[in-house]
């Protein structure tokens, strides 16, 4: 497989890069597909007379083939343009074992590239960039709903913790393991699913993931003991987490720089709105029935998504699309020589292990750009799951909201929506400057993060210091603070993700998998100590600690705005734009 050199400028909008996929394989758009079937060559070759000195049987056949190709300049079966003379390979058969059965060696075939299929120019309707807008919008909705179902499954379990503690006679931290193990599954699986999607395509990975996710949620809902619940929760997260790494890569497949930022914005909202929306829905479910219906609801939702992906989602991975095109042409023409470049990829077990496990991890710890951005992103993601424990402490224990105590989460969603609109507007400004200057470095994606990095610690400190005094301060005050926190969550997460994708475009799935691996680890760990920290230190001082950490990370986007291009220039994987 080939990839763009890290020292060559890359313009996502440039015609020569229009067909680049977010994978390790490049496809060069071309309008020509030359087909020389071996049976045709033999047929034509048999009409050529041998005018040279006496040759061996094999040499005569080879010479005949070469003469046939030169003498039969004709129209291709595939395109009605004249086919140029192909380059014929010369093969030394002297050291080869016999064919068997007394048969001579077959004639030498032309260069393999003559048979390679490509996209038919930048306007090829087969290319995902050129799919109808209605089709791409439908696929985006399906993929975003898939992400929401996965992330809702992580936090909806929190509203059933009290019932689980009573039924199975365990302390809350044991029940919270149901959340931790689920999110640990998020951390474990993307490093496998994302590179696999670059080898075998997006569709198969998403179909398997959505089916397995629905299956294991039904298993949790029907489990008879706590051990089964915990094991099935882990596998639900492990199998279901593929969209968290594959969906951004699928969006990169379908959209160029003009639209990609907006599509990733929708994905980010799905990742963050799901965990916040789930407790609001779950609180109403547990008020009227048992915790098992929390899992039944997610399982039914996931089943509907599985059906939608199975019947409506088309393969978007560019090299995999060309593989399908080659198979169709072989079937229609009978020419077994037609192939896609991606079909020539032969991976050993070692190479598969490197591409599915070690590469994302190696990238994470050897790429300073990816590591620093991921640490910041992971801290923000951990805060998201920490709030699942902090909000009940403030509003249920402090303000006495024992019924519908999860409603203040809605302020977080409002803040996220406001930030989504802000980033959408900033993306329009990004594109205006992109067209004016003829290109922008990926660091330009970090500008919204500068604002969000300041707003985020304000929201945390506001929430914790006002929520610590429920007898003096009205509940609406810490509730409003949630809008600032939600603004910061999306405003930091989304530019980080866009920056990673723009910087590692050809291997975006692996880069996102590395990011998902670390941030899911943070998301799994934070709920375990959240209760002890807020109850032990007090809501105010726990918030002070988190706020100071958030303040310490404010300079991160500023540093990359200044030093990012130089870091990428020295990178093994990132583009030097």
From Swiss-Prot:
Which membrane topology describes this protein? Multi-pass membrane protein
User: InterPro entries from the xrefs?
Assistant: MFS, MFS_dom, MFS_trans_sf
Compartment annotation: Cell membrane
What's in the keyword line of the UniProt record? Cell membrane, Glycoprotein, Membrane, Transmembrane, Transmembrane helix, Transport
Q: Effect of gene disruption?
A: Leads to intracellular accumulation of clotrimazole and increases the susceptibility to clotrimazole but also to other imidazoles such as miconazole, ketoconazole, and tioconazole; as well as triazoles such as itraconazole and fluconazole. Also increases susceptibility to other antifungal drug families such as the polyene amphotericin B, the pyrimide analog flucytosine, the fungicide mancozeb, and the polyamine spermine.
What does the record give under GO molecular function?
A: transmembrane transporter activity
Q: In the UniProt record, which residues carry a glycan?
A: 44, 58
Q: Which GO terms describe its cellular component?
A: plasma membrane
- The record's region (Disordered) falls at 1-63
The record, for Pfam families, names: MFS_1 (PF07690)
Q: Which BP terms does GO give this entry?
A: single-species biofilm formation
Q: What induces it?
A: Expression is up-regulated by clotrimazole. Expression is also up-regulated during biofilm formation.
Task: List residues traversing the bilayer.
Answer: 137-157, 167-187, 204-224, 234-254, 263-283, 293-313, 368-388, 406-426, 446-466, 475-495, 504-526, 541-561
Name the family the entry cites: Belongs to the major facilitator superfamily. DHA1 family. Polyamines/proton antiporter (TC 2.A.1.2.16) subfamily.
Tell me the function of this protein. Answer: Multidrug resistance transporter involved in resistance to azole antifungal drugs such as the imidazoles miconazole, ketoconazole, and tioconazole; as well as the triazoles itraconazole and fluconazole. Also plays a role in the resistance to other antifungal drug families such as the polyene amphotericin B, the pyrimide analog flucytosine, the fungicide mancozeb, and the polyamine spermine. Decreases the intracellular accumulation of clotrimazole by mediating its extrusion from cells. Plays a role in biofilm formation.
Stated name of the protein:
Multidrug transporter TPO1_2
Species whose genome carries this gene: Candida glabrata (strain ATCC 2001 / BCRC 20586 / JCM 3761 / NBRC 0622 / NRRL Y-65 / CBS 138)
* Protein's gene: TPO1_2
